[in-house]
Amino acid sequence: MNGFVNIAQLKQLVLYLQGEIFPDYYPAVERPDGLCLPDAFWAQVPEIARLINTDVDAVLHNDPAVPDRGEVILSYPLQYAMIHYRAAHVLHQLGVPRIPRMLTELAHSRT
């Protein structure tokens, strides 16, 4: 995939991964209470995207040197970090072990 993806494309990718690549593994990632972790995470993606948009807006409104949203998204390391931190937060809330820490450390090492 090149360029940006939207929520519909992400959902299509998830369905592909569920059905084609991980058909045996996917159902195995359920918690004892029956919550399917990938489904629970992907259900939060629109909210993560909304929050990231508010992060972009905050930079745009508070940095007079920024001409538009595109510059914030493409050139600010903050955005790279916030995407990882927001996803890690959702995973942590779902009780996923290790991966949230890995995501935050990845963002930390790059920013």
Q: PLM features: what roles do these ranges have?
A:
Residues 1-105:
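Terminal amphipathic alpha-helical/low-complexity segments used for targeting or macromolecular assembly
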Residues 107-111:
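Structural signal for interior beta-strand "rungs" in well-ordered beta-sheet cores
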